Amino acid sequence: MSKILLAGRRILKSKKFVVFGGATLIGAGLYYIDATNEDRFRRQMQNHFGITQTAHADILTELNKRPSSALPPRSELIKSLKEEEYDILVIGGGATGAGVALDSTTRGLKTALVEYDDYSSGTSSRSTKLIHGGVRYLQAAIFGLDLEQYRMVKEALFERANLLEIAPHLSYPLPIMLPVYKLWQVPYFWFGIKMYDFVSGKRVLKNSYFITKAQALERFPMLKKESLKGAIIYYDGQHNDARMNLGIVLTAIRHGAKAANHVKVEKLLKNENGKLCGARVKDMITGAEWNIRAKCVVNATGPFTDSIRMMADPDTTPICLPSAGVHIVLPGYYSPFNTGLLDPSTSDGRVIFFLPWEKMTVAGTTDASSELTFSPSPHNRDIEFILSEIRNYLGKDVSVRRGDVMSAWSGLRPLVRDPNKKDTKSLARNHIIEVSESGLVTIAGGKWTTYRHMAEETVDAAIKAHNLEPKNGCVTPGLLLDGAHNYDPLLYIHLVQDYGLEVDVAQHLANTYGDRAFVVARMCKMTGKRWPIVGHRLHEEFPYLEAEVYYAIREYACTAIDVIARRMRIAFLNTYAAHEVLEKVVQIMGKELNWSSAECRKQLEIARNFIDREMGQEARMQSVSEVALNLTKEEMQTAKDRFNQLDRDRKGHITVNDIRRHFRDHGEKIDERLLHELLNEVDLNKNGELELAEFFQLYSGLKNGQIAQNRLVRYLDELQPVSVNRSGGGI
């Protein structure tokens, strides 16, 4: 500690003190200028549409009573969308669109929502999983004398606290470690993080603190030891983003909103005065088309903002610039003791988070301009960049391999220009709300954490622009989301004791569905075993149950992807496991939704393509093709001998028939679907055949760690299945 104090004295005598001391005064000044934010917010709540504090409390108390009725089926919601007229029609079922629907319906406005794909199918399910105020925004606010950025942080910290309060089953405080490798940075970073606590005020999650080098290495043993001076631990929020998004939608529906996923807007409708009066939509499941009548249309489509704006006005100037951010998932041992890691300055000037999530580790993100697409896919170069940055922060004795990447995804950020500013080149730092001449209300930009505040301002703008008549003001601060009403951290114990579920399964159900977990538990079938009594797993290494597929249909899952990617998160956690549960998921859905055998095959094909393209399987194959051959003569001969064992006919390539025959000759019967998967995983040029060059490439990748493991090689070596949650997820 004495070294740190000496470093502090040097700072006082150096030029850094001008910055450091000036920053202190600026930070205090900024806080003083905006210290009345919370009081001002309370006054707004009291005066909004004449609502009093008592009336607001009464309304919120009534709304926070746990709804006892079941969710209406999708067919009933579609029927309402066809027959009724609405005050507000929201286009987009991501976090912001769902937030607008919830805010609108709880003000007493008749509300409809349509989503082209599934709820949270786009950007909202592909985040870093953090609920944060933005440490780097605060740094910019202090050193850049930027009051706007300071207020953004203040707003985000309020919303962070609110999210943790209204959905405690889906969100929680997460400790994040900031390693320090230069002595002068200890007081510098300590001050910045303490300012973060200070600005949080009463809503601070837990106070930050400094730990020594020894304590940091004890908590994060894989951390690079050289030059480490210590670390600062601070707290932000973390959540299950897709489930949170769904929770907002379900809450809106329970409060009266009519929402439907897989409904595409074909065109916007205008009256004789050129003002919007609804939309022509198409049900992508049934093919049915109809008009939805509405007094106001809200565009909350994220990266696709301009496509809806151009429906209203073909000559409008685009404002959205999609930017792609890639994340990867690694095994859980990369984030020990449930602690995250922050790299505050990567080689390209960004920050990278390294966070525990769902018993795995999420790392990201990158930032690059992108084409607008409904199916963004991660590129291998972005994955390699993240791995490279991780290696910089971990010890030399820790081998971070490409094959350790279990899954990877790309999400599009909706960066926007403010159309109200003359400088059209500059991007808006926060969200923007635009009301067009035809009456389209567009909300664009922003971030996950502030979705509720964005929704509130959007509904305010819609009410003003269209003279709508709400029954009360905004009541979403403190409004509990679906599953939160009777949730407590020990709920899972009741699931274990009352239903006979395994502990990890019970914890998963409680942390996914909150107090609705009991409904899922009652849907579980008897196992016929002494323990667990109920609950058939979809996959032996993950806590997901077959009963959850049935429940997912109640939550408006319409496709296999809806289930594996968003109702459950297995596609985001491990692509091999996702492939392995897919057939069972389709079998259950097919039975429940009366799918034909052709539809079941179609669902399987679409879901497999989704896993391969959007969850990183193709990028993994790309990494294999880029591996330089580095085999010795003996290793090449071993690989060639193994190849010839399979290619008995000396065709020069291996087919599914060769692999099937090899297993049969060894007395092993293997599933036909698995046979095709094994070949597809190593077939680099996707021609249905495995050539000798590809076989060499496979062995070379296994040798240098570019590939952590491969199922075909292991099957051939041992002729027995291997764990998918091993050190790496395959090629």
Q: For each of these PLM feature ranges, what is it?
A:
Residues 120-154:
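Glycine-rich active-site loop/strand segments that organize a redox cofactor
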Residues 261-277:
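A conserved short coil-to-beta-strand element within the FAD-binding core of flavoproteins
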Residues 86-113:
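N-terminal Rossmann-like FAD-binding beta1-loop-alpha1 element of flavoenzymes
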Residues 90-91, 292-302:
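Short hydrophobic core segments
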Residues 84-86, 285-296:
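Core beta-strand elements of the Rossmann-like FAD/NAD(P) dinucleotide-binding domain
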